[in-house]
Amino acid sequence: MIDYDLHIHTEYCGHAAGMTVAAICKQADLLGLRAIAITDHIFEPADHAKIETIRAEARACQGRCKVYVGAEVDVDSDHTDGRLVTDALEGLDHVIAGFHYVPTVGNYPRGPQDNVLAAEAFMDLWQSTLLGLVSNPKIHTLAHPGRLLAAAVDLDVHFDDALGVFEKAAALSAKNDIAWELNELTGYRLSGYWQEQWWRIYAVALEAGVKLVYGSDAHVPESMGQHIFVDIIREKLPTHRLARPEEVMRLQE
């Protein structure tokens, strides 16, 4: 069992019905989790009002599980240098950053057929965006590494080249103390074959000294703390150790 979950969304994100803060805290206690991080999306400074609402509601729950309140922040898809959509990160316990949208295009692909860019052009933009993203020391965790890649290009053709990019990203992540997330939801976006290959991304991270951290990316209470896909990855890695929440968020015990 992994006794924490550092990527959970609430109903305030608009696509997680039933994920009240009270329901999240109740589920965390039912699962016996020691710590969770609630990490809804923020896009502008005004979104911190939502974060403070979540923080107040979590405090009112008075559950046994430690609740950190952070945010998932996207890169700005209007640019290709990895800058975030907002730099207003103060006061967030856990900053997860990643990208869901194709750089310079801004769409959310469900498969390569949705990517209007030529694959080679996408790979160039994906590389510059990823490397810029992990050059930002304000970030604690790189969200779901490779998920956009899997949705935008044919992995059979481009995965080996992507591993070379991940090597560069891992070196920068280690330098800036940015963990890589073992994301359970990503497994549902991959074929069975690629679920079995995904560990290779994290092997690159470990080789560079990058911390690994777990997050379910839950949008319903039942998904919290689940790690079926994550266990497929972990059993193939040379070490099963995950970083503790305090390590990733750079907190003192």
Predicted regions and their residues:
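Active-site gating/metal-coordination segments in enzymes
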Residues: 61-63, 68, 73, 77-117
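Structural recognition of alpha->loop->beta junctions
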Residues: 88-94, 137, 200-213, 228-248
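Domain-core and long-helix interface of multi-subunit machines
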Residues: 9-15, 97-208
